[in-house]
Amino acid sequence: MTSTQRFVALVLLALSAGLQAHAGTKALLRFDGGIGTDPLTASNGIDVLNVVRGVNPAGRAWRVDKLRASIGKNGSISARGNGLLLASGDVIGTRAGITQVLATLACGPANNATLFHSAPAAFDTAGNFHIVGTLTQDGVNAAVLPPVCDSPVLLIRTVGAGGAPGTWLAAGIPDDTQD
């Protein structure tokens, strides 16, 4: 075998390994589009907090231009949002001083959902963010996601003291067109 043939064989082997690695990160879930939080919702004619999967809403209404996210079967997450800004109050159209956000994936029914969180990511003054990493339940170890995430909800949240998940600002819209 010539050196050129060996080189071509190595390149093909490397490409094959890369494709296999990519196949292992196939998406479990995708989200395309987002809904900003409205802190109050009507229940039997009475305003109540708009709590989603046990997570309280931010104190004001928020809106989001664009939100896309992909969650891998291995717990990887990539989420990108644009224009997540306040939709009410004296500081309307701003990020209200928030400098970091994180994502929370909820799997299961509303009264018994399992929550998985991303690490905090930068949140710029235009309301843009890009979350990349691995979901966790304890803030340290990679989460083991269920093979199927029933009733999935993706929340973009504030970051509290010590990096703890805070209130929710926006929710992702599940993309049912995934393969």
Predicted regions and their residues:
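Short, well-ordered beta-strand segments enriched in hydrophobic/aromatic residues
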Residues: 77-85
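A short, structured loop/turn motif at beta-sheet edges
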Residues: 72-76, 108-111
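N-terminal segment immediately downstream of the Sec signal-peptide cleavage site
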Residues: 22-73, 176-179
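Bacterial N-terminal signal peptides that target proteins for export
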Residues: 1-8
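Bacterial N-terminal signal peptides
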Residues: 9-17
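Helix-rich interaction surfaces within compact, conserved domain-sized segments
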Residues: 111-179
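Short coil-to-beta strand junction motifs in C2/discoidin
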Residues: 92-101
